[in-house]
Curated annotation (Swiss-Prot):
Keywords: Ribonucleoprotein, Ribosomal protein, RNA-binding, rRNA-binding, tRNA-binding. InterPro entries: Ribosomal_uS7 (IPR000235), Ribosomal_uS7_bac/org-type (IPR005717), Ribosomal_uS7_CS (IPR020606), Ribosomal_uS7_dom (IPR023798), Ribosomal_uS7_dom_sf (IPR036823). This is Small ribosomal subunit protein uS7. CDD domains: uS7_Chloroplast (cd14871). Part of the 30S ribosomal subunit. Contacts proteins S9 and S11.
Length: 156
């Protein structure tokens, strides 16, 4: 086993427009092939669309969407004596946020629509209203954890 210590995670700098770490994180998630300015434009266009459609502060809607899509528990595979059990585990705050952002981006990519900005805006609005694929994924994760509650004592 490695003798090196655990490396500290670098803090995510807030983005320049909204001064928000969450916006910066979703920009990084959307980015492909190092094209960060394109990813930023997609996110800012989506947030502008949200503000025009709802009349509310786009950042608040975005934060509510992330909060609604964040899972509280997940299952992890654990091998015990030749059998693999799905053990329910609590999700740490940082991982929960990361999973929520990952799901929001993943399902906005698979959505029908013309531009990525509009698809992202629709997914965020759905998540803020407790519907959409990201919310369904969170509910499915919670159901899996509930179904495997009997194996909770295998937690590590």
């Amino acid at each position: 086993m490695s003798r090196r210590g655990v490396i500290q995670r670098r803090p995510v700098p807030p983005d320049s427009v909204y001064n928000s770490r969450l916006v910066s994180m979703i920009i990084r998630r959307i980015m492909r092939h190092g094209k960060k300015s394109l990813a930023a434009r997609i996110v800012y266009d989506a947030l502008k669309t949200i503000e025009e459609r709802t009349g509310n502060n786009a950042l608040e809607v975005f934060e509510r969407a992330v909060r609604n899509a964040t899972p509280l528990v997940e299952v992890k595979a654990r091998r015990v004596g030749g059998a693999t059990y799905q053990v329910p585990m609590e999700v740490r705050t940082e991982r929960g946020t990361t999973l929520a952002l990952r799901w929001l981006v993943q399902f906005s990519r698979s959505r029908p629509g013309r531009t990525m900005a509009s698809r992202l805006a629709n997914e965020l609005l759905d998540a803020a209203n407790e519907s959409g694929n990201a919310i369904r994924k969170r509910e499915e994760t919670h159901r899996m954890a509930e179904a495997n509650k009997a194996f909770a004592h295998y937690r590590y």
